[in-house]
């Protein structure tokens, strides 16, 4: 009855082409980050390409699900004077509102539907199995879409609280030696900054980060990798392993490895123990091979 299709893009015009195949009646951009800059040319290129979905929805009277908390997305919608919008976010103006209760380490949050016909919107409390406060936007997006298509709040809460990630995205793995935060499917400056910031705020001892190159950043690659290692140093991280050619060019005292095989050799010789370890990098760096060794 409902098809959910990801509009993947790495070059300008990709979305414009895909919407002609799919002809969406509803649409949502979850985020605009500094990803695939090699293909898009710039952050403005990212916004312009993703905005091609908005252009199609506007022309065909489609419904836009909009994150009211994301200034870039709000501005993109405002520029196009979108016809039909259902909003969500950590904002008092959103139709579906939510806020983080805790991340210890899993995200717990509350939400309410301000667009309800009831005299007072009910507040719901949801405990998830997701790592990272940044995931509240994903939760609110799912809630908003579910409500639009007639899914009850009770069904929504049950689905979100029982979802356990198993795709190397924001998942916690507990081994005999360590606790791992595995987010090794993809990485760009925006998502890496969010993951590191969340890790910094976690009130646990013995933190360690194993970070892989952020691919496809083009001419800003050196700058973005250096900015990240500088931020890690400023935030007081002591145990950081950097993996890949781009991190290898940075000026830092953190340990560097050319590839994942060198990391495996180090783990075999001296496996870290009793650490909370953040593992994040672009999929091509293959950090997803590390959890079974740690």
Question: Where are the language model's segments positioned?
Answer:
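Short amphipathic alpha-helix with an adjacent loop that forms part of the alpha/beta core around
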Residues: 20, 264-272
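Acidic, Mg2+-coordinating active-site environments of NTP-dependent enzymes
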Residues: 26-179, 204-205, 230-239, 246-254
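Short acidic-hydrophobic, aromatic-tinged amphipathic segments that line or gate anion-handling sites
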Residues: 254-263
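Short SAM/SAH-binding signature in class I
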Residues: 2, 26, 141, 272-280
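A glycine-rich beta-strand to alpha-helix segment
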Residues: 271-294
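Switch II of P-loop NTPase G domains
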Residues: 10-22, 190-199
């Amino acid at each position: 009855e409902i098809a959910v299709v990801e509009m993947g893009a790495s070059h300008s015009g990709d979305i414009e082409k895909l919407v002609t195949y799919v002809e969406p009646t509803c649409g949502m951009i979850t985020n605009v980050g500094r990803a695939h800059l090699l293909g898009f040319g710039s952050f403005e290129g990212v916004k312009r390409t993703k905005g091609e979905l908005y252009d199609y929805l506007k022309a065909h009277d489609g419904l836009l699900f909009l994150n009211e908390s994301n200034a870039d997305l709000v501005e993109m919608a405002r520029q196009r004077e979108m016809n039909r919008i259902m909003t969500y976010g950590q904002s008092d103006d959103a139709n579906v509102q939510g806020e983080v209760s805790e991340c210890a380490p899993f995200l717990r949050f509350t939400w309410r539907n301000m667009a309800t016909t009831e005299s007072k919107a009910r507040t719901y409390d949801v405990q998830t199995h997701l790592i990272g406060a940044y995931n509240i936007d994903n939760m609110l997006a799912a809630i908003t879409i579910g409500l639009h298509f007639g899914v009850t709040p009770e069904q929504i809460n049950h689905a979100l609280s029982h979802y356990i990630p198993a795709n190397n995205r924001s998942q916690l793995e507990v081994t005999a030696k360590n606790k791992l935060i595995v987010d090794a499917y993809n990485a760009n400056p925006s998502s890496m900054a969010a993951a590191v910031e969340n890790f910094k705020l976690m009130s646990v001892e013995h933190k360690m980060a194993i970070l892989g190159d952020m691919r496809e950043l083009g001419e800003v690659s050196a700058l973005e990798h250096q900015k990240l290692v500088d931020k890690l140093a400023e935030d007081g991280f002591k145990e950081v392993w950097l993996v890949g050619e781009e991190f290898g060019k940075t000026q830092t005292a953190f340990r560097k490895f050319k590839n994942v095989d060198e990391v495996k050799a180090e783990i075999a010789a001296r496996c870290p123990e009793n650490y909370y370890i953040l593992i994040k990098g672009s999929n091509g760096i293959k950090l997803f091979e590390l959890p079974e060794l740690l």
